[in-house]
Amino acid sequence: MAVPLNLAVETEKAQALLQTFSTASLFASAGLGAFCFVADHFLTLPFIQHHLWLRALFDNTVHAIIGLWSWAIVIGLRKKSDFYEVILAGFLASVIDLDHFYMAGSLSIKAAVNLPHRPPLHCSTLIPALCFSLRLLMWACRLKDSWCSLPWMLFISLTSHHIRDGVRHGLWVCPFGNTAPISYWLYVTITATLPHLCSVLMYLTGTRDMISTKHGVAIDV
């Protein structure tokens, strides 16, 4: 009986992995890439460029939408709590821009966008460090499996933000400095495929199994 049971479990896992690339998720990813293109084009319009606060607000809103959209692709939207999760993902993708004001020591938007160097949360080396630290903290606090997706949510929110910023500034990889700016279409491609990469990594680490139990169904993203 053990062999058929194990085979059934492995078959279910394989099906869950294949569902990561379902038709619905691929359409959602294509929509995410299209949104990036349209939103970035909108940001270049003169009435946006001539108002610093408006430009910063819209740019930050785009970061938030990309973050929540990406996480929605990962987990799917099946019940009310899923919407709370994607909103949190959008918030995390957006809130890191507050470090501009921290670095500027002022609420002046002009000072915040004209810093001598990049603020701390824009160091890409911090992403794996923060995600791993959060995972260790959750383990130390013995949090329930229902919280197991938090490090991955943080990963996709921060990474999507950094990749988008990388078009203009490259990635800041401490202690090695900045990379060359990321080409625009590479940024769009990475952003659209990042949810699927995240899903595969979650599958390989067993996180998707715990989330499927939490959601009560096999996740189809």
Curated annotation (Swiss-Prot):
InterPro entries: TMEM267. The chain crosses the membrane at residues 28-48, 57-77, 86-106, 121-141, 182-204. It comes from the Eukaryota. The keyword Acyltransferase does not apply. Its main location: membrane. It is a multi-pass membrane protein. It is found in: Membrane. The keyword Transmembrane applies. One of its GO terms (cellular component) is membrane. Keywords: Membrane, Transmembrane, Transmembrane helix. This is Transmembrane protein 267. It comes from Danio rerio.
